[in-house]
Amino acid sequence: MDIRLLVLRTGDTKRLADFYSLFGLTFDYHKHGNSPFHYSATIGQTVLEIYPLTKSQTEPDKNLRLGFGIDNFDETVQKLKEFGVSFSLEPTQTDFGFMTIISDPDDRKIELYKK
C-alpha cells in the first residue's frame, strides 16, 4: 500500500501553496470536472492538492499532522526562518532522525526530516 492523494483544505489556497513551495514543491493551478480551482503538486507517487474550504467548513482542520523528508534540509530551514515561520521544535537529533517541527499558515504541525 502507498499514499496516492493528500488533500488540504484552506481559506487561502495561494498562501498555502506558496508556503509548501518553500519545501521545493512546484504547484499547478487548475480544475478538473466540477471541482473548484486548486493547487496540485506531486511528491513521488503522491499528489498533494490544496483546495478551498467546502461550503460547510468555517476553518481548516488543524489536527492533521504531516511529515516530509527534505533533501536540502539546512537551506529549507533557513528559508523558513527568513519567511517568519514559527518553529515549535528547533532542528535537533531525535530518535526518529534529525528533524524540526513547524506550523503551516493554517496552524497544522509539520515535521521536517533531514534526508
Locate each region found by the language model.
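Absolute protein N-terminus
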Residues: 1-2, 115
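Vicinal oxygen chelate
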Residues: 2-11, 30, 39-42, 57-115
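Core segments of cupin and vicinal oxygen chelate
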Residues: 7-47
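Short beta-strand-to-loop junctions in surface cap/lid or active-site-entrance loops
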Residues: 11, 53-54, 115
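Structural preference for long, well-ordered alpha-helical segments within the folded cores
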Residues: 18-22, 79, 106
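Residues that act as N-cap/strand-start positions at coil-to-secondary-structure junctions
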Residues: 33-35, 62, 94-96
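Broad, structure-driven detector of short, well-ordered beta-strand segments within folded domains
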Residues: 48-50, 112
